[in-house]
């Protein structure tokens, strides 16, 4: 939608499936190395993993940052450019990965739900103006009236920062906005996704429902 502003909160959005032959090691790597490694980068606030119950890819990782500036530091460039051998191996095991670095342009409610709905808004939503962002914020406020819906976030990918992963399809990448709906139950996530899709004129194929696996916050590192 609107051009990303570096002072807005950011999210690194990584959605992928994994090679079934190496899925155990893939999850071990994510849980024991990768999430902590990313959350330790200055400016990162949390790393959260989800597993899909409905959608095109099985695993989603969300890494929240104070701002998009966190993706332009020497610490981030070092982590992204100098992957560990374990990371190199598992990045190649990703199947149909999707990496986006996004600004959070509209946010309603608060917190992290046990369930998450993900809606891709499609190419027509790219480059829309501030009024469209305000409209998404208003939609989020409406969805909060559904019992169990606790937060919504509109993510706008930054074209410069959203470089593809090694196994990601380079041709025809669409950096469309993404709408996240956090909920305390699966039924609430589904109801909100259906309501949002109806309001936005999307079809069910653009909805995904995921369950929370675990979350690591930057504050947890100091408590350990």
Which stretches of residues belong to each language-model region?
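Macromolecular interaction modules
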Residues: 1-224
């Amino acid at each position: 939608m609107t051009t990303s502003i570096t002072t807005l909160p950011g999210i690194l959005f990584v959605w992928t499936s994994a090679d079934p032959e190496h899925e155990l090691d893939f999850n071990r790597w994510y849980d024991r190395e990768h999430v902590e490694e990313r959350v330790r980068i200055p400016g990162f606030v949390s790393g959260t993993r989800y597993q899909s119950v409905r959608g095109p890819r099985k695993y989603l990782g969300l890494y929240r940052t104070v701002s998009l500036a966190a993706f332009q530091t020497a610490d981030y460039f070092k982590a992204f450019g100098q992957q560990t051998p374990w990371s190199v191996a598992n990045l190649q095991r990703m199947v149909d990965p999707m990496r986006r670095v996004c600004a959070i342009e509209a946010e309603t409610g608060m917190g992290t739900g046990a369930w998450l709905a993900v809606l891709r808004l499609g190419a027509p939503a790219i480059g829309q103006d501030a009024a469209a962002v305000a409209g998404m914020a208003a939609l989020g406020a409406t969805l909060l009236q559904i019992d169990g819906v606790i937060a919504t976030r509109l993510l706008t990918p930054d074209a410069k920062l959203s470089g593809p992963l090694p196994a990601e399809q380079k041709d025809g990448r669409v950096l469309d906005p993404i709408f996240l709906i956090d909920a305390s139950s699966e039924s609430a996530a589904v109801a909100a996704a259906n309501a949002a899709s109806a309001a936005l004129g999307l079809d069910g194929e653009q909805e995904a429902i995921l369950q929370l696996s675990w979350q690591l916050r930057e504050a947890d590192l100091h408590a350990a």
